[in-house]
Structures are given as C-alpha cells and as structure tokens.
C-alpha cells in the first residue's frame, strides 16, 4: 500500500519516497518482502503518489487515492490478486524479511491483523494516532495484515520493526535511530 498523501509528514516528497536513512521507505518495504517467503509483490499506488508508481520496479495496481480502506478495497478487487493477500504499508522502514515470515507463520487462515501495544509506540516515541481496545489492552494497528476469507484474528507483537510507522518527521528520526 503506497498511495497515501502523507499530510502529517509535512514534506514535499511523496510519503512512500520519503527517505529514512537515505533510502525511500517504499524501497525498504519492497526489500523486506523480497527477503521473505512472499512469492509475488504487487504495489498499490494512487494518483496521490505518481512518482512512486514510476519509481517502483514491481507490478502496480492503481487505487483511487481515497484513503487506506478504499485503496485496499480497490486493490483486493483486482483480478490479479487472490486471497489470502499480505498487505503492508509503505511507511514501515524497519520491516525486514524475518518479521514478514513471522507474520506469515502466524497466519492460520482467514484474516490476520498485526497489532502492537499502544504503550510500545509511546515508549519508542512514535505517533499512535489510531488505537483501540483488544482483549483488555490498548493496541495500535501496524499496517501489516493478511486479508483472507474466513474468521478474523489478531496477532499482538512487541516488535519495534512493525511498531514504527513513519507518519511525522519525529517518527522518521526514531526510525533512523534503529536502522
């Protein structure tokens, strides 16, 4: 998923192309997927990120750029994808193949949402704009999911590699400390 506007990032660069540690975030995510057991990578840019589409060297499914959920729905409706589908946000510069493989190993069918404790995000010093209660804990989605057919499940981890989403310049500084 690489079509966001990145308004909270407050930069001229398209969010997926924003450099963390000198490398565009989307390149870091594609690299993590290539280093994992994922067998096919398809990007989902939008009109909000035209330079991202031309930058990528993987097949793309154009999305409408109307927000994460609408873009995800558009991507999943494309005939080139079949479920289950691993979805990953382009703003996870610490992601690596090992973490991706752990997510895949945790998927037991249906859909899987990867969550982190909101307290972990706060402890790391990164933004936690979206939180909710799950099983008596306040958690935050990571931007990593498996979308399948069947029951929904959640996987809670304390792994900073999925906890650090870059939404602000301050988040980028935190990410760079862990590279």
Which functions belong to the PLM regions below?
Residues 55, 95-179:
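Conserved core of the sugar-phosphate nucleotidyltransferase
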Residues 25-89, 133-134:
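Conserved N-terminal catalytic core of the sugar/cofactor nucleotidyltransferase
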Residues 4, 91, 168:
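Active-site glycine-centered loops adjacent to acidic/histidine catalytic or metal-binding residues
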Residues 1-13:
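N-terminal nucleotide-binding beta1-loop-alpha1 segment
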Residues 15-29:
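Short catalytic helix/loop segments, enriched in acidic residues and glycine
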Residues 2-3, 44-45, 89, 115-116:
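Short beta-strand/turn micro-motifs composed of small residues
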């Amino acid at each position: 998923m690489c079509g966001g506007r990145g308004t909270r990032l407050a930069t001229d660069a398209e969010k997926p192309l924003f450099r963390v540690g000198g490398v565009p975030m989307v390149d870091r995510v594609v690299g993590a997927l290539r280093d994992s057991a994922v067998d096919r990578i398809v990007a989902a840019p939008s009109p909000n990120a035209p330079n991202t589409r031309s930058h990528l060297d993987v097949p793309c499914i154009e999305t409408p750029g109307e927000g994460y959920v609408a873009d995800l729905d558009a991507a999943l409706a494309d005939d080139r994808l079949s479920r289950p589908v691993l979805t990953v946000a382009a703003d996870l510069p610490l992601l690596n193949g090992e973490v991706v493989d752990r997510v895949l190993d945790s998927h037991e069918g249906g859909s899987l949402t990867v969550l982190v404790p909101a307290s972990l995000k706060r402890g790391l010093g990164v933004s936690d704009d979206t939180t909710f209660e799950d099983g008596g804990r306040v958690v935050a989605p990571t931007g990593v999911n498996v979308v399948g057919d069947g029951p929904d499940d959640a996987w809670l981890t304390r792994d900073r590699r999925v906890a650090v989403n870059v939404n602000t310049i301050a988040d980028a500084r935190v990410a760079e400390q862990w590279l």
